[in-house]
């Protein structure tokens, strides 16, 4: 019996090795030209974020056919089905420099606006799946360090209990902190400052939470060490 069990284990290990080798041999990342299909021939600009909802739909964040949405009437938040078929888009005229996006467990779409111009930007906006604005954090066009202002927020995520975590800052003279809010948008706390020391940030670029609500903030490629 022990010998048979050992043979089964060896067979499983061998199978795992073969599968791992096959996966490793695949091109990563791979590219599929023409996946996104627009009915009006729209061309995409700089794509800053992408996420997938629970139904398998793909959400993309486009900088309005260019690298900025300032003065544009193009809708930057785009929804595709799993085959790349265009479903809807929204957010036109609301964002300056869309950067981070997060689709929460209820299907709401969160977007960060990491710049400011003409009285817009430096905000985090929560949209419903059909494009209604449900919540706005930060003061439009006003950079700052207070509990109700941001300076170039780069990313947003929500924890399993609905709490909101925002990576506030995008290099330069912007902020370098994590800001936490209740699910209703009430300020809870903020931490971090611009520094290369452990637990601090020079340039924030992405954020995520695990099942326990622990936040993970990522620096850009030049500073790959994450903070937890």
Indicate where each model-derived feature is located.
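N-terminal secretory signal peptides that target proteins for export/translocation
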Residues: 1-6
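Short beta-strand-initiation
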Residues: 8-9, 45
């Amino acid at each position: 019996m022990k010998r048979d069990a050992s043979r089964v284990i060896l067979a499983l290990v061998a199978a795992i090795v073969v599968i791992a080798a096959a996966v490793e041999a695949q091109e990563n990342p791979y590219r599929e030209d023409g996946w996104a299909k627009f009915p009006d021939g729209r061309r995409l600009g700089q794509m800053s974020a992408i996420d997938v909802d629970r139904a398998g739909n793909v959400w993309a964040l486009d900088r309005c056919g260019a690298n900025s949405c300032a003065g544009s009437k193009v809708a930057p938040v785009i929804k595709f089905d799993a085959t790349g078929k265009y479903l809807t888009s929204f957010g036109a005229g609301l964002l300056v420099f869309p950067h981070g996006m997060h689709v929460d467990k209820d299907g709401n779409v969160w977007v960060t606006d990491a710049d400011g111009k003409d009285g817009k930007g430096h905000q985090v906006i929560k949209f419903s799946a059909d494009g209604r604005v449900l919540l706005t954090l930060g003061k439009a066009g006003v950079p700052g360090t207070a509990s109700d202002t941001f300076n170039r927020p780069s990313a947003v995520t929500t924890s399993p209990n609905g709490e909101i975590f925002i990576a506030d800052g995008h290099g330069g003279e912007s902020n370098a902190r994590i800001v936490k809010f209740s699910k209703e948008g009430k300020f809870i706390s903020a931490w971090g400052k611009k520094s290369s020391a452990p637990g601090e940030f020079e340039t924030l670029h992405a954020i995520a939470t695990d099942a326990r609500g622990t936040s993970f903030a990522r620096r850009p490629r030049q500073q790959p060490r994450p903070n937890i």
